Swiss-Prot record:
Family of the protein in this entry: Belongs to the complex I 49 kDa subunit family.
PANTHER family reported in the protein's UniProt record: NADH DEHYDROGENASE [UBIQUINONE] IRON-SULFUR PROTEIN 2, MITOCHONDRIAL (PTHR11993:SF10), NADH-UBIQUINONE OXIDOREDUCTASE 49 KDA SUBUNIT (PTHR11993)
Single GO molecular function: quinone binding
Catalysed reaction equations from the record: a plastoquinone + NADH + (n+1) H(+)(in) = a plastoquinol + NAD(+) + n H(+)(out); a plastoquinone + NADPH + (n+1) H(+)(in) = a plastoquinol + NADP(+) + n H(+)(out)
Descriptive protein name: NAD(P)H-quinone oxidoreductase subunit H, chloroplastic
Keyword annotations: Chloroplast, Membrane, NAD, NADP, Plastid, Plastoquinone, Quinone, Thylakoid, Translocase, Transport
Note: There is a 56 residue fragment from the N-terminus in a second position on the plastid genome (corresponds to 9311163); it is not clear if this is transcribed.
Subcellular location field: Plastid, Chloroplast thylakoid membrane
Keyword presence, RNA-binding: no
Role description: NDH shuttles electrons from NAD(P)H:plastoquinone, via FMN and iron-sulfur (Fe-S) centers, to quinones in the photosynthetic chain and possibly in a chloroplast respiratory chain. The immediate electron acceptor for the enzyme in this species is believed to be plastoquinone. Couples the redox reaction to proton translocation, and thus conserves the redox energy in a proton gradient.
Length: 393
């Protein structure tokens, strides 16, 4: 720890890794002077599973079902970056319909992630009612996911060159019905929460981050935009079809926990706006680039080769990564989710580096909680919005 313990009246408290307010298995060693926080040291790694090394010993096709375990509340984004990196590396074009379907799924996943941030965040502050309200809307999103992908979570829906299946009959009407219903729900949240004096007392001026600090610490997502920096990769990188829709980057200049709350509430509204435009303008055509299915040219087999030992052998699809390197990124609900990919003319990536937004955003926590009260730790930690699956990887 950074502070030498010279005073005898200081108290050291362990928060986590098993704690009802902890967002996953995070452990904080907090040094207290009464109720004032003197120092805070996060202890990470309880959920480390070696995901980068696993990626370097699998083909992209084999690895794809596993990536949903990074951020298991925004699984569409982990799938998106996993297929985007090889697509950019090999310059694979995806059909326009597939791109629109991806945008719809990504924005639905963004809303679901923000909802499951809002409920526990309010519960941390002592408000139980919104915690139950958010599950009502979140279940409707998961019903849409289940109808389109077959799974409520861990969808395994994105593919290199498109998506796994087209949208089923009647899905678009159900999606539009949800959008109309959810906009009324957001208004209900704001009436219930935003002007609540107890809520404002807990979040206003708590966990302040200036714009310069946010940039210097490498923060991204709502953490960055709440400090006055208008930076959204959907506008900056123009990936998928985001440049074909009319929407605004949500940002605030106050830089406190209230600003981060307002940014996420605004993002849910903008996501609905994007979904409505995408659903109404979705083009026809294929949902997958079928040329990519050929992946790798099969070698000429010999009669004594392994291929002929089993009559029913069906080789798994392979995708050879050329000898290049690139950095791909998407705007996930928690910030910039990136992949640094190095290929070396083999089926496995030579290097697969994950840049998780939660891991970077969590680094500023000790600075934010110093000189604050003990009860403010959960407010600040909740406003950061972390999932330990992607922090520890």
């Amino acid at each position: 720890m950074s502070l030498p313990l010279t005073r005898k009246d200081l108290m050291i408290v362990n928060m986590g890794p098993q704690h009802p307010s902890m967002h996953g298995v995070l452990r904080l060693i907090v040094t207290l002077d009464g109720e004032d926080v003197i120092d805070c040291e996060p202890i990470l790694g309880y959920l480390h599973r070696g995901m980068e090394k696993i990626a370097e010993n699998r083909t992209i096709i084999q690895y794809l079902p596993y990536v949903t375990r990074w951020d298991y509340l925004a699984t569409m984004f982990t799938e998106a970056i996993t297929v985007n990196a090889p697509e950019f590396l090999e310059n694979i074009q995806i059909p326009q319909r597939a791109s629109y379907i991806r945008v719809i799924m990504l924005e639905l996943s963004r809303i679901a992630s923000h909802l499951l941030w809002l409920g526990p965040f309010m519960a941390d502050l002592g408000a139980q009612t919104p915690f139950f309200y958010i599950f009502r809307e979140r279940e409707l999103i998961y019903d849409l996911f289940e109808a389109a992908t077959g799974m409520r979570m861990m969808h395994n829906y994105f593919r290199i060159g498109g998506v796994a299946a087209d949208l089923p009959y009647g899905w678009i009407d159900k999606c539009l019905d949800f959008c109309d219903y959810f906009l009324r729900g957001v208004i209900e949240y704001q009436q219930l929460i935003t002007q609540n004096p107890i809520f404002l007392e807990r979040v206003e001026g708590v966990g302040f981050i200036s714009g310069e600090e946010a940039v210097n610490w490498g923060l991204s997502g709502p953490m960055l935009r709440a400090s006055g920096i208008q930076w959204d990769l959907r506008k900056v990188d123009l990936y998928e079809s985001y440049n074909q829709f009319d929407w605004k980057v949500q940002w605030q200049k106050e830089g406190d926990s209230l600003a981060r709350y307002l940014v996420r509430i605004g993002e849910m509204r903008e996501s609905i706006k994007i979904i409505q435009q995408a659903v109404e303008k979705i083009p026809g055509g294929p949902y997958e680039n079928l040329e990519v299915r050929r992946f790798k040219k099969a070698k000429n087999s010999e009669w004594n080769d392994f291929e002929y030992r089993f009559l029913g052998k069906k080789p798994s699809p392979n995708f050879e990564l050329s000898k290049q390197e690139l950095y791909a990124r998407v705007e996930a609900p928690k910030g910039e989710l990136g992949i640094y990919l190095v290929g070396d003319d083999s089926l496995f990536p030579w290097r697969w580096k994950i840049r998780p937004p939660g891991f970077i955003n969590l680094q500023i926590l000790p600075q934010l909680v110093k000189k604050m009260k003990l009860a403010d730790i959960m407010t600040i930690l909740g406003s950061i919005d972390i999932i330990m699956g992607e922090v520890d990887r």
